[in-house]
Amino acid sequence: MRRFEMTSPMSFARLLVVLLAVAGFGLTLVIFYPGVMTYDAKFVYEDIAKHTLGDWQSPVMTVLWSVVDPLAPGSASIFLLMAAMYWLSFGLLGYALADRSMGLAVSSPVLALMPPAFFFVGIIWRDVLFGVTWLLAAIVAFVESDREGKDRILAQAVALFLCGFGVLLRPNSLIAAPILAAYIIWPARFRWRRAALIFVPAIAIFFGLVQFIYYGALGATRQHPLQSIMVFDLGGISHFAKENEFPVRWNDREQELVLNCCYRPTEWDIYWRLEPCKFVMHRLEAGEKLFGTSAITEAWARAVARHPIAYVEHRASFMWNFLSGSNLTIWVANVENPSETLFPGRPAFAALRAVHDALKPTPLFRAGSWLLVSMAIMIFAWRRRDTREGAFAIGVCGSAIVYVLTFFAVGVASDFRYAYWAVLASVASVPVLLGPPTLRRG
């Protein structure tokens, strides 16, 4: 009887967590099924039909989608996978916290309903898939972090696989990945010396992984996504330095546009597909056929060397807009029929849009807010770095901070989704840190 009284509350808490996670998954289906297709997702799905793989979007996402697609052809297959990973993550976290208190356990699936996290689960972007992949990796490691033996080793192997898979989805995460990997390898406590020791070798390993999988195993076509960053930088440097840094000559009207009118610290699309400045990429790509060649790389290197202050001004302007601006959040357009409303006659989705529209002007939907929250959590967790709870928070929030900051150098658009990993890392860390540290089990 004594044993039953001690274990019954924990069992009830775990059952409640499972029910809440299942209910959350069901709510996700009611609101979003069969998933919100974006233009990025549409391009990836079209590559499946064409049997082509490119590196502009992640070829690994194309392969993954092609594998799960027979289960529910179209957007539904990848949507169901993302939603399942999301609720599995928060369900596992709550299940693991049930031995501490029912309140902490239940708070995990409840916090999963926070608008900046939940509102993106049904939107098919690789940034969302990346976020839930890393979230699941960290939580799988956390669940077994107070144990020793084969179960923990298996959990760590799964978590490291998911960490690497996330890098393959978002290669700019390879600088942040070593922090998450260090947590997965040593989940019981965080030691900065160990993390520093593996940092550079881990970057090299993850970089090699991308090269091997993308171009060796999958044979992806090189579409030169890095040069989109360089084109954006050349436009920014030209604007701030008031000198044309593109490797082409413009006529007087084009020169005026490039130096004074085209540039906005929001996105590189202004030089690619938006009037009146899409002539820039048309000239570089179709006209002079320079895009994808060393001419762009050399022009970029010269521009940065000649005008480092202009480069920093451009990048700082972009980063400020990314962190503080009212940027694109959830996707609500119907990409198949742009003139039609997405999910007409669905009250649940309409209610979600209404809540989103009311909250969008608030700090909840600012990337900078979640960067600051991640920093605050990491500072708070530092004094508990010798515990599994502190190690978890430092691992996820530390990697989120570095990941968001990479956009200072590589960002070409300001969408809120690029900070989605920081949202998930922060939300997951809250219930972990709220209670007292747990004792280590054998």
Predicted regions and their residues:
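Aromatic- and kink-enriched transmembrane "portal" helix at the membrane-lumen/periplasm boundary
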Residues: 30, 59-62, 66, 71-75, ...
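Transmembrane-helix motifs of polytopic, lipid-linked glycan transferases
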Residues: 80-100, 136
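Membrane-proximal stem/loop segments at transmembrane-domain junctions that anchor or position
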Residues: 219-342
